[in-house]
Every structure is written in structure tokens, then in C-alpha cells.
Amino acid sequence: MSATLALTEQLIARASVTPDDQHCQQIMTERLAALGFDCETVASHGVTNLWAVKRGTDGRDGKLLAFAGHTDVVPTGPLEQWTSPPFVPAHRDGKLYGRGAADMKTSLAAFVVAAEEFVAAHPDHRGAIAFLITSDEEGPATDGTVKVVELLESRGERLDYCIVGEPTSTAELGDVVKNGRRGSMSGELIVKGVQGHIAYPHLAKNPIHLLAPALAELAAEQWDEGNEYFPPTTWQVSNLRAGTGATNVIPGHADLLFNFRFSTASTVEGLQARVHAILDKHQLDYTLKWTVSGLPFLTPRGELSNALEHAIRAETGLTTELSTTGGTSDGRFIARICPQVIEFGPPNGSIHKIDEHIEVRFVEPLKNVYRRVLEQLIA
């Protein structure tokens, strides 16, 4: 069994459901410390974070390449639906099964082993290697990567390159990498009416009826046309609640939850202003609370994307696709202190599902791609 596969299994065996790290970072820290990394634990409200860095011969003047990832996994769902226990690594039909196999314990193991091989081959490497690891990516993400980024900002620390080990591939390893992500902004809208008997609508104000025309306009709105890198901004309703459950009561209020996934073609302030303008146009009595989960970020083609594309082609023969589709990731926080952030990891077809798995044939090539990038950028 390869060192990468063995470490992957060791990490999968830890039931590290958010925010419980279950000592995964301790396993990583022991191996990184043996390589000469300075390892620092950053704890926050039950979340465990790791910042580990190994400087090269250029010291602080050298380029710094960081790997960012998370040790936490999503809950398993019904255990009886799993073919084998989710935290007992199992091999079947050329696949390794277990919660976190694809998202993202294989990536964690691959970069640790890549760093070990790189340091052994290049003991006098010029640039620096760092790990930014959290146990709060799958949850609220309020005490994880963002806290480490804030700490690094306070120290004036800057990263030159960052690879986030998210499972970006689809059918084959390396067919897709993410060089950006859309922003995410949610709204909690309460439209006020007047409760009353449904037989006497003239004595009440039905908030659902009041909201409906504005809702139709919001759903039909073209927020932007996107751009070269991003699809158009989308607006979607996630929840609509009103009423007591009775058939003869007009509700006193209607509650709407919605979400924007927005590109760099729009701004937070601009989208908020347009929503308020539509609601005000329909003369609604409302309150609206906004939550911005992350801003869009984009890494144009440059040293990191070139190195990653070259490494993927050399290892797999594939020409990779740069993409900004999908949900948010911790890359949105890291982009504040790093001009080049790209996400790359194994295929994502089974993530967050029963019987999550990774094809074993992808494990060593993933490690090799990571090692090739280290060699190209900081050796």
C-alpha cells in the first residue's frame, strides 16, 4: 500500500464530523513537524485549525505556496444505508469507500506525502510550503479558515499561491479545476399583513397576495449577463412560509428565504439596492436581513494555473478546464491574502452521498500532480 493511500485510510478512520477534528490535524502535524514545519494550532469555539509553514533558503523573501483544506466531513446519514461502515475504510471494485474519501481526506493525505517527497528530493528548496487546515468548512465556516486568514492578516503575512484541495474533478482526475467561485448572499424577507378570517378578506391583508407580484418580478429579473469567467448571476427562493396550517385563516405575515449566487459582474450593494427597489415599488411593508457568505473571486491565468495545468497534463495526459461553477469554498477567504487561489482535487461524483468513495487509481496521480506543482514553483 502506498504512503498516500495509507494516510488517507488513517484519516478516514477518524469520525471528524464538523466541527470535531478527531485528531486528524494531530496526525498531519506529527508528519509535518518531522519535515521541519513550524506548526501552530489556532482554536476557536470548538473548531481546530492548523497553520504550518516551512521556509526555504530564500527565507521570507521566497515565494510561499500554501495548501488549504479541511479535516471535517458532513454527517453520514442513515448508517444502515451504507454498504460498509462510513468510518471504516473499505476497498471494493478498485474504490476506497468511507466518509471523506473524496471530500477531502485523500487530498489532505496526497499533499502531505507530496511535501514529504518534495523536501526529501529538494532539501534546499528556495520557496516556502504552508498548510492551512480547518475542521469548520462543512459547517458555518465562521471559526475556521477565516480565523486563520484574519490572524495572518494581522501579522502582515501574504501568500503567493494557494491550492485548495476541494474535489473539483468530474469524470477523470484533472479534467476540471476551479480558478474562481461565485459569491453567495442570502436574504430573509418578512412581508407583513393583517391576520383575519378567510371569509372576510376586506378585514385582513393577505401578505402572500401582496408578495406574489414582487416575487414574480424578482424571479424574472435579469441581474447581469455574467462575463468571460462567470455565468450570469442567479436568484433563487429556498423557503416560503406563511399561515398557521388552518384553512380558514389569512396569515399575518409571509416569510421568504432567498439566495444570490453572483459573479464579478455585480456587487453586493448593487444587488441589494435592486431588490429593495422592487419591493418598494410594490409598496410592501417588510423587513429584510442580508447575509453575505462570500464574495466572488477569480484567479486569472498565471504562474499557479500554468504550473497546475502542466502538472496535470504530464501526469494524466489531460488538458484541464478552468471553471468557476459550483458552490462556495474556503477559497473566498484565502483570496483576501493570496492573489492566486486555485482548487484542485479528485472527482466529486460521490461527495456528501451514501457510500462516498474515490477510485484508487486516482490517489497516486493526485499526489504526483501536487508534487510537480511544488517542484515548478518553489524548488
Curated annotation (Swiss-Prot):
Requisite cofactors: Zn(2+); Co(2+)
Annotated residues for binding of Zn(2+) 2 = D103, E138, H352
One Pfam family named in its UniProt record:
M20_dimer
GO terms (molecular function) for this protein are: acetylornithine deacetylase activity; cobalt ion binding; succinyl-diaminopimelate desuccinylase activity; zinc ion binding
- PROSITE patterns annotated for this entry? ARGE_DAPE_CPG2_1
Question: Main EC class of this protein?
Answer: hydrolase
Is ATP-binding among this UniProt entry's keywords?
Answer: no
Copy the pathway line from the protein's UniProt record.
Answer: Amino-acid biosynthesis; L-lysine biosynthesis via DAP pathway; LL-2,6-diaminopimelate from (S)-tetrahydrodipicolinate (succinylase route): step 3/3
User: Which reaction equations make up its catalytic activity?
Assistant: N-succinyl-(2S,6S)-2,6-diaminopimelate + H2O = (2S,6S)-2,6-diaminopimelate + succinate
The entry's active site is D72, E137 (proton acceptor)
Query: How and how many cofactors are bound, per the record note?
Result: Binds 2 Zn(2+) or Co(2+) ions per subunit.
Q: Keywords for this entry?
A: Amino-acid biosynthesis, Cobalt, Diaminopimelate biosynthesis, Hydrolase, Lysine biosynthesis, Metal-binding, Zinc
Q: For binding Zn(2+) 1, which residues are annotated in this chain's numbering?
A: H70, D103, E166
Question: Disulfide connectivity?
Answer: none
What does the UniProt function comment say about this protein?
Catalyzes the hydrolysis of N-succinyl-L,L-diaminopimelic acid (SDAP), forming succinate and LL-2,6-diaminopimelate (DAP), an intermediate involved in the bacterial biosynthesis of lysine and meso-diaminopimelic acid, an essential component of bacterial cell walls.
The record's comment on protein family reads:
Belongs to the peptidase M20A family. DapE subfamily.
Q: What is this protein called?
A: Succinyl-diaminopimelate desuccinylase
Gene coding for it: dapE
